[in-house]
């Protein structure tokens, strides 16, 4: 894992530190052959490969062993924060001696600035920044610039604009014991690095002064650096716990990076301001020629204010909109992103590529359409367009070697890969579920019989419907029939989701009904039956990819079965069934040849297969408190769970718990203190 909590000295070791997987088991099933094929492919010069791995085949472990084989810095891109956090935890466990970092959007809440011409309404940018995720982003870029053994797990934030890495390097501040430097000179240099002086609230990105002692809290670190002066000489440097004040170690040297990714040297800043002022004059003239004096005044006031802030502090709110001026780029060129912090040779792993690639492809156009209105109405200069995500073509150009990972890779991955490596046989020797087609006529009554059979065997059932109304009606019908059933819908928050999954695993409920049950966290060993209603209806929820993914929910149980309710066999059904049967035959033949007997995966009920799965979400009553005392007791329990969730990087879960705490405090008029507004940051172990 990352050692940014370790010594603050330059991180690059004298001897290259190799990637080394520390797993409690060896590759098994199809893993050894897949690892060899993929590693050999990259050594032979293949740029793009696909790992087609069925659910439960250990794709993450295979990727880890490939990284160990090819020894290259690696970027892993997931399609949402939750999945990214899950992968981050897994890679941290597999690479305990290497730098495993996490890079996602640092906004708990984000409303980008926008202008609605029809109603002449300007919506200002509104955001809530998660300080801990901000720290992790800085930790990621620092690791990439100071060491070679780095794995960064990211969301699509990886393709959004970031500061010029050359500025980030050039502005680094090196300190050594015995170095002659005036204390006030060092304070000025810290301000240039966008650190703020705060002698009271000592947080990341700040420093404080006490006589001849200076304490700096790096933006990316878990510990602070105490610098003790003797006259104009650095006498001693210590790494200290900022909360406890405990000295962790004595440091001979330290390397400090800027507190902002958009930090810029003074000379470059002045050149940027000159460019901005020149463009501003041109834009004012443009609006005046159009007779749009409101827009002319608006762009002048807003831009002038930003310029004054940059001149005074080297920074302004929304500085990213001037990023093209702050770097040596021309308008229209690709922005600097996280990818530019990687060396020339690195591996990009696109996880769940069938979902992640379309997401990457769609980012550019969505950003452009929003900014067009802002620029045309005088809220931003035209160079705001250059603060953007990469186009898909730019993303491909910036990535060196790529590995697409999915149980159902799309046509793009197949067409653009030098080879597709299949991982069909699971290390657990479980086979894909048997598939049966049943008539849609009388499907509810038939389903009820199947549910009764599974309940008698102490097994669980997942049911997926096409519409919200149908899911609600089915849930009500099953309840009236005496079934312990719950309904998971799109408004189910993360905390409720954890509770539902845990209840299903414990047997408090036997059936879970939903519309789209593909989200991560539903690989539940107790589920032996997946029922897909109206399976022959064409559409996204009944496409070949979705059907194969949904069928895979029953692949963790030795008795796994899938029933498709349909009156006709659609093309998607036919393809999905054929693929599942093909995989099942391969798995059964392998088990027969090697004498393996599959068994259901055993997993502690406290886990939910979500990031930080050691967090137990049960035990907190979701019922309303009857009085203030009970509310206080519930809040104490919730606060403990909120901290646990944040420690495990389950930020969405922590935010949901925070919202429940707020509701209880408001309902009973309880004092929330100063820390009720934010999700707590993970503790030192992080």
Swiss-Prot record:
Limits of the UVR domain: 632-667
Q: Name one GO biological process term.
A: SOS response
UniProt motif (Beta-hairpin) ranges: 106-129
Tell me where in or outside the cell this protein is found: Cytoplasm
Instruction: Outline the extent of the Helicase C-terminal domain.
Output: 443-606
Q: Where is the composition biased (Polar residues)?
A: 610-624
**Source taxon at top rank:** Archaea
Q: InterPro entries, alphabetically?
A: Helicase/UvrB_N (IPR006935), Helicase_ATP-bd (IPR014001), Helicase_C-like (IPR001650), P-loop_NTPase (IPR027417), UVR_dom (IPR001943), UVR_dom_sf (IPR036876), UvrB (IPR004807), UvrB_inter (IPR041471)
Residues annotated as binding ATP are: 53-60
UniProt family annotation: Belongs to the UvrB family.
Classification via PANTHER family: UVRABC SYSTEM PROTEIN B
Provide the domain comment. Answer: The beta-hairpin motif is involved in DNA binding.
Name this protein carries in UniProt: UvrABC system protein B
Which species is this UniProt entry from? Haloarcula marismortui (strain ATCC 43049 / DSM 3752 / JCM 8966 / VKM B-1809)
């Amino acid at each position: 894992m990352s050692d940014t909590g370790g010594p603050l000295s330059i991180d690059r070791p004298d001897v290259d530190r190799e990637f080394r997987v520390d797993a409690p088991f060896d590759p098994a099933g199809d893993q050894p052959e897949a690892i060899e094929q993929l590693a050999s492919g990259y050594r032979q010069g293949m740029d793009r490969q696909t790992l087609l791995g069925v659910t439960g085949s250990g794709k993450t472990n295979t990727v880890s062993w490939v990284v160990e084989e090819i020894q290259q810095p690696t970027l892993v891109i997931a399609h949402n924060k939750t999945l990214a956090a899950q992968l981050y935890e897994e890679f941290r466990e597999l690479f305990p001696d290497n730098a495993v970092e996490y890079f996602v959007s640092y906004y708990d809440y984000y409303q980008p600035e926008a202008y609605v011409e029809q109603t002449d309404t300007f919506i200002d940018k509104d955001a809530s920044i998660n300080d801990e995720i901000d720290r992790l982003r800085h930790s990621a870029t620092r690791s990439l610039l100071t060491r070679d053994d780095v794995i960064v797990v990211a969301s699509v934030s990886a393709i959004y604009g970031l500061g010029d890495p050359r500025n980030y390097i050039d502005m680094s501040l090196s300190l050594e014991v015995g170095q002659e430097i005036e204390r006030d000179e060092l304070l000025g240099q810290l301000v240039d690095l966008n650190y703020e002086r705060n002698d009271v609230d000592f947080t990341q990105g700040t420093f404080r002064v006490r006589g001849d002692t200076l304490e700096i809290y790096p933006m990316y670190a878990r510990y602070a650096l105490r610098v003790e002066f003797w006259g104009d000489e650095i006498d001693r440097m210590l790494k200290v716990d900022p909360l406890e004040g405990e000295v962790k170690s004595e440091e001979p040297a330290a390397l400090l990076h800027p507190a902002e990714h958009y930090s810029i040297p003074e000379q470059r800043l002045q050149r940027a301001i000159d460019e901005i002022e020149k463009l501003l004059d041109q834009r004012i003239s443009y609006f005046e020629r159009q007779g749009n004096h409101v827009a002319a005044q608006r762009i002048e006031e807003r831009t002038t204010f930003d310029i004054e802030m940059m001149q005074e502090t080297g920074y302004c709110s929304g500085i990213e909109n001037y990023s093209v001026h702050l770097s040596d780029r021309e308008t229209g060129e690709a922005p600097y992103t996280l990818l530019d912090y990687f060396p020339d040779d690195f591996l990009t792993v696109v996880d769940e590529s069938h979902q992640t690639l379309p997401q990457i492809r769609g980012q550019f156009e969505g950003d452009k359409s929003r900014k067009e209105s802002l620029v045309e109405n005088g809220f931003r200069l035209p160079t705001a367009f250059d603060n953007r995500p990469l186009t898909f073509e730019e993303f491909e150009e910036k990535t060196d070697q790529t590995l697409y990972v999915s149980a159902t890779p799309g046509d793009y991955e197949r067409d653009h890969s030098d080879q597709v490596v299949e991982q069909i046989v699971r290390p657990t020797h479980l086979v894909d579920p048997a598939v049966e087609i049943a008539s849609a006529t009388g499907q509810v009554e038939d389903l009820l019989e199947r549910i009764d059979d599974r309940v008698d065997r102490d097994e669980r059932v997942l049911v997926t419907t096409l519409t919200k109304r149908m899911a609600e009606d089915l849930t009500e019908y099953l309840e009236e029939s005496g079934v312990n059933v719950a309904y998971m819908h799109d408004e189910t928050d993360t905390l409720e989701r954890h509770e539902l999954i845990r209840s299903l695993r414990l047997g408090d409920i036997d059936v879970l009904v939903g519309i789209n049950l593909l989200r991560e966290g539903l690989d539940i060993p107790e589920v032996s039956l997946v029922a897909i209603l109206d399976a022959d209806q064409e559409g996204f929820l009944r496409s070949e990819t979705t059907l194969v993914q949904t069928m895979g929910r029953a692949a963790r149980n030795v008795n796994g079965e899938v029933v498709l309710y349909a009156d006709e066999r659609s093309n998607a059904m036919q393809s999905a069934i054929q693929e599942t049967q093909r995989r099942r035959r391969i798995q059964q033949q392998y088990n027969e040849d090697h004498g393996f007997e599959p068994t259901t995966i055993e997993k502690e009920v406290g886990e939910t297969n979500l990031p930080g799965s050691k967090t137990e979400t049960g035990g907190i009553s979701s019922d309303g408190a009857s009085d203030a005392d009970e509310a206080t007791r519930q809040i104490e329990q919730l606060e403990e769970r909120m901290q646990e969730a944040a420690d495990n990087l389950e930020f969405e879960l922590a935010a949901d718990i925070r919202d429940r705490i707020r509701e209880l405090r408001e309902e009973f008029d309880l004092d929330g203190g100063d820390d009720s507004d934010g999700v707590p940051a993970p503790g030192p172990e992080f």
